């Protein structure tokens, strides 16, 4: 009777091994789920960035406000009859 119990427990253990550790087992499923959640987060951040870039491209195509803003801040351009005044920032410790 004791050998039968040991044999059945061993059979159950051998049947459980592929379920938990084998190819396609629960441990792999949990790992794939974790990777999927990480990839979804990366994708969400990239979609937000792409939406911002798309809005900027549409604004550049349709209006001159974005072009003027870029010319002023990135290139330092000023309009005709406009005076440019630059105030230097104070450096801490001086």
From Swiss-Prot:
Residues 31-73 form a coiled coil. It is a single-pass type II membrane protein. It is found in: Cell inner membrane. One of its GO terms (cellular component) is cell septum. It comes from the Bacteria. The chain crosses the membrane at residues 4-21. The keyword Cell membrane applies. GO terms for biological process: FtsZ-dependent cytokinesis. Residues 22-94 are periplasmic. Its main location: membrane. Keywords: Cell cycle, Cell division, Cell inner membrane, Cell membrane, Coiled coil, Membrane, Transmembrane, Transmembrane helix. Residues 1-3 are cytoplasmic. InterPro entries: Cell_div_FtsB, FtsL/DivIC. Essential cell division protein. May link together the upstream cell division proteins, which are predominantly cytoplasmic, with the downstream cell division proteins, which are predominantly periplasmic. Belongs to the FtsB family. Part of a complex composed of FtsB, FtsL and FtsQ. This is Cell division protein FtsB. The lineage of its organism: Bacteria, Pseudomonadati, Pseudomonadota, Betaproteobacteria, Rhodocyclales.
